[in-house]
């Protein structure tokens, strides 16, 4: 009976999935597709006879009709999207680990909380890093053969220089950009300033990945000589992408709506429709981040804005920077406690092949914001 009940539950879930993939009940809110990161877990994935992934969860209705169609047309791509989101969230948390806003996330469909309903710098970074994460993961999955509809980027072939030529398997960043633009941008609706800034920041994330592609080469020749080299293009590390976007966050441009219409058909933000709030400032480039409202006060909890505050956060009592107790705790002060920490130490490599370590316990001073 339990087996029969399980089979009926699976069948019902599949019916719900088909209904969500073909129905009209799509949710078009900006960023709702981020909920995939909570849906596309290994426990929710099955594979049919054609090796096509099915997600047994009607939460895919979080996607727009266009997004669901793109997943159906590109078998295997759901894993890449989820992986890209995981990477983007991890990078966001690392980049802002010492800031008052430290990229908090939830298990709700709107992963980043209410901050995405605003138009501040933090919102801009979230849209850029998640867009970059999808492009980066899809491009790599193509070259790894994990997506049926794409392969390596073989456009660069033949001679490349006097002692090297193009070859190998380049990461398919063009497919990653194309799919990212179609998938990510299709969740945006409207023709207002929020629509334009979201699309601009989405594109800034994709452009950063594409612009930081790196050439790698392998030598060929007798006895290890490098008579000729075969070269291909490789994706940058996502840490490099995060570092670049963090720099753009610090120098983000506050913009206003130029009221010249919008390029809705191409699903891209036209830079001509965004102008600096300060006429003396230059127009933002395609890789700059843009925002249109001041960031909320992240010092204290505020349910309306979705800010968690900094109470309980660990701070550095000797640092004058943003991670210092004076700035991170917003002048409220901090408490100090002693904590015992156990770490691996005195590690030794043994041939062949394992490493043995001892456990060392030390007492550390921990400062926490009041």
Curated annotation (Swiss-Prot):
Which biological process terms from the Gene Ontology are attached to this UniProt entry? brain segmentation; canonical Wnt signaling pathway; cell fate commitment; cerebellum morphogenesis; fourth ventricle development; hindbrain development; midbrain-hindbrain boundary development; neuron differentiation
Keyword annotations from UniProtKB, A to Z: Developmental protein, Differentiation, Disulfide bond, Extracellular matrix, Glycoprotein, Lipoprotein, Neurogenesis, Secreted, Signal, Wnt signaling pathway
GO CC annotation terms, alphabetical: extracellular space
Q: Where is the lipid attached (O-palmitoleoyl serine)?
A: 223
Q: Which domain of life is it from?
A: Eukaryota
Q: Basic and acidic residues bias: where?
A: 267-280
Gene3D superfamilies, per the entry:
3.30.2460.20
Q: Where in the cell is it found?
A: Secreted, Extracellular space, Extracellular matrix; Secreted
Q: Which InterPro entries match?
A: Wnt, Wnt1, Wnt_C, Wnt_CS
Keyword Secreted listed? The answer is: yes
The record's statement on gene disruption is:
Morpholino knockdown results in broadening of hindbrain boundary marker expression.
Task: Tell me one Pfam family matched here.
Answer: wnt
Free-text description of this protein's post-translational modifications in UniProt: Palmitoleoylation is required for efficient binding to frizzled receptors. Palmitoleoylation is necessary for proper trafficking to cell surface. Depalmitoleoylated by NOTUM, leading to inhibit Wnt signaling pathway.
Task: Give this protein's Gene Ontology molecular function annotations.
Answer: cytokine activity; frizzled binding
Where do the record's region annotations for Disordered lie?
261-282
- Provide the leader sequence positions: 1-19
The record's family statement is: Belongs to the Wnt family.
Protein name per Swiss-Prot or TrEMBL: Protein Wnt-1
Q: Which species does the entry assign this protein to? A: Danio rerio
